[in-house]
Every structure is written in C-alpha cells, then in structure tokens.
Amino acid sequence: MLNRLLIFITLALAVRALDCSSKELQQYNLESVKGTYSISNIKSTPPSKTNITWSIGICEPIKDVADCPQNSDVCGITSILIDGKSPVVSEIIGFNSNVQKEYETIAEGDGGIIVKDKAVNWGDSLIDAEIHFICDKNAKENDLKLDKWDGQSVKLSFKSKAACITSDKDKKKNNGNNNDNNKNNDKKKDNGELWGWFTWIFIFLVLFLSIYYCGVRARGSSTIRETPFYFQSALKEVIENFIDLLKSLPSFIREIIERFTGSSGRAEYSAV
C-alpha cells in the first residue's frame, strides 16, 4: 500500500492573479474567458495509474480545484490511482499569482502571446511554466492542452478567439454599435412618452366635445347656421380650459409636495 506523499510548495502570499489589464495583455480580450481551466493526462504506471492535472486561472486565481495552493494561477497535481482505493496525491506544484511574469508575442499564424513564469522553487528544483495563448479566429470553444511536462518545465497552450488582437478600429466600431443601441432605446422611450401625451389630449378633447354636443342638443340648436357659432365658442372654451389646466398642474403638484414636506418639517420642529 502506497503511503501518501505530499510535496506542497507555495510562493509568497498574494491576491493578484494574471493581470489581464496589464499593458502587455490589454490588446487581447482575455477578460472574456475569465475563469479556471484544467487538463488531465492519465498514463499507465503498473500496478497503478498516474493522473497529472494542470490548471490555469485566467484574470483570476484558480478556483474550485482541490489541493491547489491558494492564490495560484498555474497548478499541477499528480495523483496515484489504484483500483478500489481513493486517489493518493503525490505532487502539488503551485505557481503563485504574484510571480513576476514575462511576455512574448507569437509571430506565427494568427498570433497570440506567451506568459512565462521562470525559476519557481519546488522542493530542490526550479520549475518553469509557459502558457501559450494562441489566436484562433475560428475557435468555437476554448481549448487547453498540455504540450510538455518533463519535471523541470511545463508548457500549456490555450487556443481561443480571446487571444486575438482587437484593433482600435474594431473597439470603436463596437462602441459605436453600443451607442446606436442606446440612441434607439432613447428614441423608443421618447416616442412612448409622446404618444402618452397625445392620448391624454385626445381623451380631453373628446370629453369636452361630447359635453359641447350635449349642450347644443339641450339648447335645441339644430340649425346649420347656429351650429358653427356654438362649435367655435365651445372649442375656444375647451382650449382655454385645457391650457389653464396645464398651467395649474405645476402649482397643484407643488402644493401637494409642500403639504407632505411641510407637515413633516413642522412635526420635526415641534419635537425639537
């Protein structure tokens, strides 16, 4: 039976992960793929199997990966698998997120960028790590692969659209589309408010014209000559009343507000 052998390495404590806002990474859209990604490689090592899982944290420390050191953005865990028994963790390699990074652009293909951690202490060894963020404009999913692990250096590749350079023109275009959407929303809002006012005006006009019509009928004025006179007079009266109503609304609302605020103020003053 294998005894649990735990090699646990952590570097200086820190809370900062791979800084996607750094000037080297600003031109990429890595913030859109923020999160933790893992890749496992199982090989037969009779009488057991060995599972090596590497995880990376993009724009934030690695989360929800058991046994990974706190505040690490690159982490490798080696487990021994034996049928009928619980996995035994034999190695834990953690690259703290505060380790000084080195950056190198990728010239081949559609480009990308390499993030490097160099000479990280792990027991008696120094370990290097490289994450190749490779631009793939046709990628439908984000693809993490383990390209190399020889006990001294680990090389991981991450293919994604997020690793493609976004030009200033495209950024302005996206901002322009957002502004157009905001303008359209404002126009829709303004149109809705305008139609609301027209609806109320129409209701008032119909109401007053109905009153006028009833008044004409009550007076018994049904001749053609008398109708225009009463119509013009009533219409003028309706318009004047409607204008007076609109003018009185602000003072009416102000009076209501003053009643509430005034009574509240007096109550506070009396209490003092």
Curated annotation (Swiss-Prot):
<keyword id="KW-0732">Signal</keyword>
<keyword id="KW-1015">Disulfide bond</keyword>
<feature type="topological domain" description="Cytoplasmic">
    <location>
        <begin position="215"/>
        <end position="272"/>
    </location>
</feature>
<feature type="disulfide bond">
    <location>
        <begin position="68"/>
        <end position="75"/>
    </location>
</feature>
<dbReference type="GO" id="GO:0034045">
    <property type="term" value="C:phagophore assembly site membrane"/>
</dbReference>
<feature type="disulfide bond">
    <location>
        <begin position="135"/>
        <end position="164"/>
    </location>
</feature>
<keyword id="KW-0496">Mitochondrion</keyword>
<feature type="domain" description="MRH">
    <location>
        <begin position="18"/>
        <end position="166"/>
    </location>
</feature>
<keyword id="KW-0333">Golgi apparatus</keyword>
<dbReference type="Pfam" id="PF09451">
    <property type="entry name" value="ATG27"/>
</dbReference>
<dbReference type="InterPro" id="IPR018939">
    <property type="entry name" value="Autophagy-rel_prot_27"/>
</dbReference>
<feature type="signal peptide">
    <location>
        <begin position="1"/>
        <end position="17"/>
    </location>
</feature>
<dbReference type="InterPro" id="IPR009011">
    <property type="entry name" value="Man6P_isomerase_rcpt-bd_dom_sf"/>
</dbReference>
<keyword id="KW-0072">Autophagy</keyword>
<feature type="topological domain" description="Lumenal">
    <location>
        <begin position="18"/>
        <end position="193"/>
    </location>
</feature>
<keyword id="KW-0472">Membrane</keyword>
<dbReference type="InterPro" id="IPR044865">
    <property type="entry name" value="MRH_dom"/>
</dbReference>
<protein>
    <recommendedName>
        <fullName>Autophagy-related protein 27</fullName>
    </recommendedName>
</protein>
<dbReference type="GO" id="GO:0015031">
    <property type="term" value="P:protein transport"/>
</dbReference>
<dbReference type="GO" id="GO:0030659">
    <property type="term" value="C:cytoplasmic vesicle membrane"/>
</dbReference>
<comment type="function">
    <text>Effector of VPS34 phosphatidylinositol 3-phosphate kinase signaling. Regulates the cytoplasm to vacuole transport (Cvt) vesicle formation. Plays a role in ATG protein retrieval from the pre-autophagosomal structure (PAS) and is especially required for autophagy-dependent cycling of ATG9.</text>
</comment>
<comment type="similarity">
    <text>Belongs to the ATG27 family.</text>
</comment>
<dbReference type="GO" id="GO:0031966">
    <property type="term" value="C:mitochondrial membrane"/>
</dbReference>
<feature type="transmembrane region" description="Helical">
    <location>
        <begin position="194"/>
        <end position="214"/>
    </location>
</feature>
<keyword id="KW-0813">Transport</keyword>
<keyword id="KW-1133">Transmembrane helix</keyword>
<feature type="disulfide bond">
    <location>
        <begin position="20"/>
        <end position="59"/>
    </location>
</feature>
<keyword id="KW-0812">Transmembrane</keyword>
<dbReference type="GO" id="GO:0000139">
    <property type="term" value="C:Golgi membrane"/>
</dbReference>
<dbReference type="GO" id="GO:0006914">
    <property type="term" value="P:autophagy"/>
</dbReference>
<keyword id="KW-0653">Protein transport</keyword>
<keyword id="KW-0968">Cytoplasmic vesicle</keyword>
